[in-house]
Swiss-Prot record:
It is found in: Cytoplasm. Its EC number is 6.1.1.20. GO terms for biological process: phenylalanyl-tRNA aminoacylation. Its cofactor is Mg(2+). Tetramer of two alpha and two beta subunits. It comes from Herminiimonas arsenicoxydans. HAMAP family: Phe_tRNA_synth_alpha1. It is an enzyme of class 6 (ligase). InterPro entries: aa-tRNA-synth_II (IPR006195), aa-tRNA-synth_II/BPL/LPL (IPR045864), Phe-tRNA-synth_IIc_asu (IPR004529), Phe-tRNA_ligase_II_N (IPR004188), Phe_tRNA_ligase_alpha1_bac (IPR022911), Phenylalanyl-tRNA_Synthase (IPR002319), tRNA-bd_arm (IPR010978). SUPFAM superfamilies: Class II aaRS and biotin synthetases (SSF55681), tRNA-binding arm (SSF46589). This is Phenylalanine--tRNA ligase alpha subunit.
Length: 338
């Protein structure tokens, strides 16, 4: 056996002994690298006579091809073995039971929002929507709040740089009443509508948040009275709190957009809040100036309005003491409502 045949056999043996890609590359360098044995054989051809060079060159090339074939075969074998090992490690047992995906839930305030729409919708109230960035006129002036009213100060209202297309200052709405103004100016009486949505005020503590949710209701018609308003609201709170065992009372109050105005309190006949009067809403007869700004004759039509904080209703319904819990994103709290 000539030396080149022995070299091929040795290379095949070394390649077969390589158990990973790094070892195989080291073995390759021994035979096919810049200083490898086949490379050195090729360099020695220059010392031979032309006839010998041709003959010996063919022998060396044949040996080189056999070594390269052995290298390729071993490289493929290692690659296949690696893939098989990986597949075995990542194998899926199709007999195992599936793992369910975690599901989210409806936020408690959103539950209240949906329930409010459902209750008022069942007695014929529409649902209004409107922009959260409002102009000064719709948020304040149209609702009978004069320019020197404290609510207009930057200590209570988030103002935005710039004006609207009519030059009116822009702000984040402080209540959802502007949606009622917009709705009323586009519709004719009789009007029965609620306006739920996000509102913003410069306030933050255990019972207040700079962003909170309100629902406000508006009823405009002929020949309606406070008795109708009381009946509607009593129907609402009984349906919302799912009990007939409660009372409603109206206390005199003041709001610039209603006259007369009242605070609405409820008292439960049973449960942990039994006997306590709890404020849940403000209400009143729509002020004549507001009626005119909506485009109605206050001598012909009567309007009643009411408004409640959705967080307040949610806190009373579920016995929650701190408003900030709604916005901390704590799953331990939120999972209780799923």
């Amino acid at each position: 056996m000539n030396p080149l045949d022995q070299l091929v056999i040795q290379a095949q043996t070394d390649f077969a002994a390589a158990d990973d890609a790094a070892a195989l590359e080291n073995a390759k360098a021994k035979y096919l690298g810049k200083t490898g044995q086949i490379t050195e054989q090729m360099k020695s051809l220059g010392k031979l006579a032309p006839d010998e060079r041709k003959t010996q060159g063919a022998v060396i090339n044949s040996a080189k091809e056999k070594i390269e074939a052995a290298l390729t075969a071993r490289r493929d074998a290692l690659s296949n073995a690696q893939m098989e090992s990986r597949l075995n490690a990542e194998a899926i047992d199709i007999t195992l039971p599936g793992r369910g995906r975690g599901t989210g839930g409806i936020h408690p305030v959103m539950r209240t929002w949906q329930r409010v729409e459902e209750i008022f919708g069942s007695i014929g109230f529409d649902v209004a929507d409107g922009p959260e960035i409002e102009n000064d006129w719709t948020n304040f002036t149209a609702l009978n709040s004069p320019e020197n009213h404290p609510a207009r100060s930057m200590q209570d209202t988030f103002y935005i740089e710039g004006n609207d297309t009519q030059g009116k200052p822009l702000l984040l709405r402080t209540h959802t009443s502007p949606m009622q103004v917009r709705y009323a100016r586009m519709n004719k009486p009789p009007i029965r509508v609620i306006a739920p949505g996000r509102t913003y005020r410069v306030d933050s503590d255990a019972t207040h948040s700079p962003m909170f949710h309100q629902v406000e209701g508006l009823w405009i018609d002929e020949n309606i009275s406070f008795a109708d308003l009381k009946g509607v609201y009593l129907n609402f709170v009984k349906a919302f709190f799912e009990t007939d065992d409660l009372q409603v009372r109206f206390r005199p109050s003041y709001f610039p957009f209603t006259e007369p105005s009242a605070e609405i309190d409820i008292a439960f006949g049973s449960g942990p809040l039994k006997g306590r009067w709890l404020e849940v809403s403000g209400a009143g007869q729509v002020h004549p100036n507001v009626m005119r700004n909506m485009g109605f004759d206050p001598e012909q039509f009567i309007g009643f309005a009411f408004g409640s904080g959705l967080e307040r209703l949610t806190m009373l319904r579920y016995g929650i003491n701190d408003l900030r819990l709604f916005y901390e994103g704590d799953l331990r709290f939120l999972k209780q409502f799923n």
